[in-house]
A protein has these predicted regions:
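N-terminal targeting leaders only when they are immediately followed by extended low-complexity/repeat-rich tracts
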Residues: 1-2, 163
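Structured ligand/cofactor/substrate-binding pocket environments in proteins
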Residues: 3-14, 72-121
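Gly/Thr-rich phosphate-binding loop signature of adenosyl cofactor/nucleotide-binding cores
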Residues: 3-78, 142
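C-terminal, helix-dominated tail/subdomain
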Residues: 26-44, 51-54, 99-167
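Charged, low-complexity, intrinsically disordered terminal regions
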Residues: 170-171
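Short loop/turn segments at secondary-structure transitions that flank enzyme active sites
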Residues: 9-12, 22, 87, 129-132, ...
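Active-site proximal loops enriched in glycine and acidic residues that flank catalytic Cys/His/Asp
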Residues: 67, 85-88, 94, 127, ...
Length: 171
């Protein structure tokens, strides 16, 4: 609902940043999220990227790269793709603490709303803030809400998006 996005979520983000000195720290996540992320921090990852590779949209995933290109060019990412963008950073970094540091860095550096309380709400939602535990428990994610590029392709018309934001798109 548009009212939720404009009022409820905006005010919740501001309230969290004003009332919690550690709003931008890993330890500010809900206990369940910290536990599940810590339980899976050492899970094997198929891909690991460093901050430079993320910054330059140099991953194996065309959808993720397109989202990063949009972020760098326009200072924003389509809302649904922004969620996927963050979830993949969690999946492709050595542990959730590094993922969070990359998320904050990329968001603050490139997003028009970087450093805004709403932006921090979005970044921390990726790791479980303002969400609930989800099942089944999965490697890397644990009980954190899971998203894939494949499932995104079924919910979002990617062809024009990839034509605009990908390098050498074949979609």
């Amino acid at each position: 609902c548009i009212r939720d996005r404009l009022i409820t979520w905006r005010e919740l983000g501001y309230h969290t940043c004003i009332k919690r000195a550690n709003y931008d720290q890993y330890q500010s996540l809900p206990d369940w999220a910290i536990k599940t992320l810590d339980d899976h921090a050492n899970d094997e990852r198929e891909y690991i990227y460093d901050l430079s590779e993320f910054t330059n949209a140099n991953t194996h995933d065309e959808i993720w790269n397109a989202a990063q290109n949009q972020l760098k060019t326009e200072g924003r990412i389509h809302n649904y793709l922004r969620m996927l963008w963050g979830k993949k950073i969690l999946e492709w970094t050595p542990n959730p603490q590094i993922a969070l540091s990359y998320l904050i860095d990329l968001n603050d550096r490139f997003a028009l709303d970087g450093r805004d309380p709403n932006s921090y709400s979005g970044v921390f939602w990726i790791l479980g803030r303002y969400d609930r535990a989800w099942g089944p428990e999965r490697p890397i994610y644990g009980k954190i809400r899971y998203m894939t590029s494949k499932s995104t392709a079924t919910k979002f018309n990617l062809k024009p998006y990839l034509e605009k934001w990908s390098v050498g798109s074949t979609v």
